[in-house]
């Protein structure tokens, strides 16, 4: 069996949700424009480092999603998101703070580990390069709001960055956040992951996989305000046995969707 960070995160969020998605085959409908934009934008960033036309790649990828029945929030439209994306690419290129020396082999890099249980764990790292001259693992993120900058080094607590450090053995990690707002902004965060953090994450993975293999899928009930994750969970219709909610939010894929390549952009 092969696991990924996404699967571990889903299980820790709610074991029942994990079962609905990865064992029963239910999957959330792709109606969230921010998610589809993020995928298209990552492809455009990769094209930028390959010295291709990133704006053309973004628009080409975006044209496939424009008429997909997406649900927008506020004043967002697909054309507006694409315009912001082009502006972010231009700002990022002007900053010139990130370098990838081998862009054809150092982007979307696959790493695999064999766990103590005999299962495998796979990760796809956005890129391995340099931020301000420091070699590091690079992660691209798109957001409609700025990430907090204080306290300094807060990104070292991001579990996905810890995961990337554990998988690659690289201490230095960096998160590049492309912020879509009226005046676009690119944020740069770098952190150092300790050996203790990597070992703790490895233990967390082993423990979680052990529970999954044991068929332990109890629900994490969340209707206790103000902590109410169940109200925004796309799988809530399954837990409430309400077919209308299921039909609105989910589709069922034939067979089991193991989600092994959730983090693979292309």
Predicted regions and their residues:
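Short, compositionally biased low-complexity segments
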Residues: 11-19, 52-69, 169-181
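A non-catalytic, helix-rich entry segment at domain boundaries
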Residues: 40-110, 114
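Nuclease catalytic cores
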Residues: 8-53, 82, 107, 232-235
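Short acidic, Pro/Gly- and aromatic-enriched capping/linker segments at domain boundaries
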Residues: 1-7
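Metal-dependent nuclease catalytic regions and adjoining charged, substrate-binding loops involved
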Residues: 154, 165-266
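Short amphipathic alpha-helical segments and their helix-coil junctions
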Residues: 15-28, 64-69, 137, 145-146, ...
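Mg2+/Mn2+-dependent nuclease catalytic core
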Residues: 103-210
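Hydrophobic (often cysteine-bearing) scaffold residues that line and stabilize catalytic clefts
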Residues: 33, 37, 81, 157-160, ...
